[in-house]
Amino acid sequence: MKHHNYYPSTCLSILPFLLPLTMSHPQQNLLATTTSNTKAGNPVFPGWYADPEARLFNAQYWIYPTYSADYSEQTFFDAFSSPDLLTWTKHPTILNITNIPWSTNRAAWAPSVGRRLRSSANAEEEYDYFLYFSVGDGTGIGVAKSTTGKPEGPYEDVLGEPLVNGTVYGAEAIDAQIFQDDDGRNWLYFGGWSHAVVVELGEDMISLKGDYLEITPEGYVEGPWMLKRNGIYYYMFSVGGWGDNSYGVSYVTADSPTGPFSSTPKKILQGNDAVGTSTGHNSVFTPDGQDYYIVYHRRYVNDTARDHRVTCIDRMYFNEAGEILPVNITLEGVEGRTLS
């Protein structure tokens, strides 16, 4: 959660990125900070962006982040797509919250995107895409729908009011994540103020089904992410203070998406003074069900400006017991990889 901003001239003066297209183009092709012929480098694209959610849609990698800026400047969401983890295309302003009357026109945080098949065909036009977002520093969590049937939108608010309104079990209505289980059920995880909540989504993906459940694990602060692997549910979340190097990621496990969860969290992501600090608010993707990648934000070493957060990708590994191993954060990033 929290702020982000992107100043093209400033970022280009301090980061070794190339922008082949002009800034006025509706989509901007970006190169990651490539450190070799095969590795992307971290951060993966320019600009102050945090809370990155990774998705795999239509043989492309997608990242939906928060724009890291003052609350008053956070009035939109950008998205980024890549065929290979090396070259990224920026899709500006996929949702403008100033067009949403209930939004308060500030503090647009932590988007999460899911999709629903319209028919049995697998063409991209056969999907409806839904974007869950929080605005107004806890005003509520809304849901928007792609008007084009594509993951880049643009998206428009579909309810005219929040899907989740106000505080639930002490949880601020921020940092939504849609988790689409392999049994066809959809779950919405969310929560700030050190409380975590989950609720099932209706089949239409724009309504709630059933009751809210509080699932707060020890140390939870914000930024939930649910991952399922080999029948085990890994509930990942941010711990510590997002403004300093106590920020990190821990996880607990369960046999169901609503718990009960293991009682002792394990911390697997932590910044350091050699690579980057304030590492947190993660997501995870796997291209093949075997190799796993963690996407997260961090700050440059010795940069304490609260909104100077950048998006990074590193590998994530499991041991034979199914435990997530501590992540080695890097400057070189991950190797390029296409999706079949």
Swiss-Prot record:
The keyword Transferase does not apply. The active site is at D51, E222. One of its GO terms (biological process) is carbohydrate metabolic process. Optimum pH is 5.0. Optimum temperature is 25 degrees Celsius. InterPro entries: Glyco_hydro_43, Glyco_hydro_beta-prop_sf, Glycosyl_Hydrlase_43_Enz. Pathway: Glycan degradation. GO terms for cellular component: extracellular region. Keywords: Carbohydrate metabolism, Glycoprotein, Glycosidase, Hydrolase, Secreted, Signal. This is Beta-D-galactofuranosidase xynD. The gene is xynD.
